[in-house]
């Protein structure tokens, strides 16, 4: 992950991806690999994988990117394509993907 310099402006692009699993065990393996590898991509500030406590078999990836261009580059990357292809047959429907811009963001130095 890129460690921001103290003088860096905080300009975050946040992506959420929600997945409803048909095969939770196999899906978690795909998503965990994606998260670990994506954290090393240029412009990545953080990526977390969460499991819902209110909706069984629902998983959420939360990504924070240094800029909109870093996020776009990642979405066009081989790692993103590989993850999407690996999810084939593991979901009950398409993932819900949302893109946010940081309204109030703070990075700890």
Residues of each region from the PLM?
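Short S/T/G/P-rich N-terminal loop/turn motif that feeds into the first structured element of a domain
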Residues: 1-46, 50-59, 66-76, 92-109
């Amino acid at each position: 992950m890129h460690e921001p310099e103290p003088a860096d402006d905080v300009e975050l692009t946040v992506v959420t991806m929600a997945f409803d699993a048909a095969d939770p065990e196999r899906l978690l393996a795909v998503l965990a690999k994606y998260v670990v590898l994506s954290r090393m991509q240029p412009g990545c500030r953080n990526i977390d994988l969460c499991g819902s406590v209110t909706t069984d078999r629902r998983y959420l990836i939360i990504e924070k990117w240094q800029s909109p261009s870093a996020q776009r580059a990642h979405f066009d990357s081989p790692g993103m394509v590989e993850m999407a292809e690996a999810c084939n047959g593991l979901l009950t429907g398409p993932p819900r993907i949302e893109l946010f811009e940081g309204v109030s963001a703070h990075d700890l130095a």
